[in-house]
């Protein structure tokens, strides 16, 4: 009964099915861990959500920025971001709202002491140890799954504040927690988020670090599994930090990481690479 962490699917239903065939997935016994961004940009977000929703073994899911965007559209009155969105089919589906309520009750962080794994969409803020990250994930999850979710989704967007402080309260506190868990790529040497630069490591400004290389980063006792960052193409500089967004939608692959032995499996995705 293996566990598999799956990289950013982003509505790519056919590659997901091919990947599950490759790993000989047994839906009655195996457990899937989805690193987030189940939806958007790809052609089949509704099919992806319906499939994952129907799995007999409850999957572990950490929400990504595109998942939160869908929830903002469904429940927060957020406007369409632009022509790249492919969420209309979900929005118009008879079960779209039901799927949205299921999605908003998913996690920001999942962990297993038995597997020595912690998973989140973008990573763990350099300023947080594991205990802090778990506590803040629980705090945001309580809002998403609680009665005030409409208010949060209506106001979640924004790049400020851009650094964690224990003194933060209210929406500012929730927004920076959200941005670290779902949007983070680069930080400065003090752990301050930079949400502007999204390119390759080789061309990054000198003052920016990948979040997992920030000099002041607190050590996390478990292996970290994260997605979100297709430009890494599954590579990080740390043997215990596993990047599994391999650009399925951008000329790369869709990747599964078997958590028992950290072995990777991949199938081709769609499109032409943006990262060569």
Swiss-Prot record:
The keyword Hydrolase applies. Keywords: Hydrolase. It catalyses: P(1),P(4)-bis(5'-adenosyl) tetraphosphate + H2O = 2 ADP + 2 H(+). Its EC number is 3.6.1.41. GO terms for molecular function: bis(5'-nucleosyl)-tetraphosphatase (symmetrical) activity. InterPro entries: ApaH, Calcineurin-like_PHP_ApaH, Metallo-depent_PP-like. HAMAP family: ApaH. Hydrolyzes diadenosine 5',5'''-P1,P4-tetraphosphate to yield ADP. Belongs to the Ap4A hydrolase family. This is Bis(5'-nucleosyl)-tetraphosphatase, symmetrical. It comes from Legionella pneumophila (strain Corby). The lineage of its organism: Bacteria, Pseudomonadati, Pseudomonadota, Gammaproteobacteria, Legionellales.
